[in-house]
């Protein structure tokens, strides 16, 4: 975690030195192509759950937004929502039996009981005693998967990009209602 944040800061400071007089689109493009991939590499699986770690990652993006747009409130999608979408897409690939995710997909189980309000693609969450187990990739993602509305998952199987667009729409509608 510390290595990733340090590497992202180095890349961001490099961009800030080189593009000091560049326009905002160039700065944004440099951030999204050079810094964001560092912050998101493998983020679907190692998504941090502690507030301090999440704040460290968000500080890098806020600094880049301030540098790019000269404002404190960026209109960019938050890193947390991007990681959540990536986790849900990865679980979809495991649920669909994609070869790279087969080890996880083989261990997914349907719940013993479904209420009428639940969708039929619900996955049973595993009980864990430790924080490492509770907040692991699989358990956190299953919790979010089960909270998705039936319309998003209703027409599976579909392409991962289609699912990503649907989930993105649901997450952004939910976040706009909270504001």
In which residue ranges do the predicted regions lie?
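Hydrophobic/basic alpha-helical segments
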Residues: 1-179
